[in-house]
């Protein structure tokens, strides 16, 4: 099966529809599928529920989909960098399901592994546990969390071969493997595509069995979320 598509728009064609549950990889602005997010915005699909570690920032990442009102609900761990998100949420225009970061990762991992639910202590005694099953194990209370099974996963990897085997780069790996494994359909944006067999086995972080479509974007912007620099240190003794 041919997995490589000539554009992000074509990679989404026939797969993404109104009202779907989507999962998007990344951590902050690191490791996000920029071209796929732009193509999703341009497709005009509406009423999306989006699973992601965060909601992007104003004008970039998932923030673009918030500006066009294509997201009706977010399932996320952190949303503090996006003023438009704040405005929509406080105006009751956007639904939000907060999920602790580790729990979110495990819900996605469980979905990809075929595990329907699991128990965790995280969130017990807080609003996170409201309406969920609680159970005692060895004198400790745990809350049951259900797996996440997105209709479509949008993923960013560094490199792929023609068969869809993926290699991630440094911290851009983050949530992407779990997001890829959980999706019923997985679409991946990469910076380089190589021939099948040219990658060493130990370079492959995720096997191509999880990947359905690939698009190459060799020059993503990779915007820095917050630039921090160290002040120049002067040697007062030698001055």
Question: What are the residue ranges of the model-derived segments?
Answer:
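Conserved alpha/beta enzyme-core scaffold
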Residues: 1-239
């Amino acid at each position: 099966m041919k997995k490589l598509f000539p554009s992000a728009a074509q990679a989404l064609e026939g797969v993404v529809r109104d009202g779907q549950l989507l999962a998007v990889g990344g951590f902050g602005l690191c490791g996000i599928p920029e071209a796929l997010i732009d193509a999703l915005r341009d497709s005009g699909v509406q009423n999306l529920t989006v699973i992601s570690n965060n909601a992007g920032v104003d004008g970039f990442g998932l923030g673009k989909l918030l500006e066009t009102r294509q997201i009706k609900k977010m399932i996320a761990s952190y949303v503090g960098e996006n003023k438009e998100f704040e405005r929509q949420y406080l105006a009751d225009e956007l639904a939000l399901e907060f999920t602790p970061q580790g729990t979110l990762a495990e819900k996605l991992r469980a979905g990809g592994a075929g595990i329907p639910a699991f128990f965790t202590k995280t969130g017990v005694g807080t609003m996170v546990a409201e309406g969920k099953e609680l159970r005692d194990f060895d004198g400790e209370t745990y809350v049951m969390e259900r797996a996440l099974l997105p209709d479509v996963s949008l993923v960013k990897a560094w490199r792929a071969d023609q068969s869809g085997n993926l290699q991630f780069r440094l911290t851009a790996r983050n949530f992407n493997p779990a997001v890829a494994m959980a999706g019923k359909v997985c679409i991946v944006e990469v910076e380089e595509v190589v021939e099948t067999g040219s990658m060493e086995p130990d370079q492959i972080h995720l096997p191509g069995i999880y990947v359905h479509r690939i698009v190459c974007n060799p020059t993503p912007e990779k915007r820095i979320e917050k630039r921090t620099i160290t002040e120049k240190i002067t040697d007062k003794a030698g001055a």
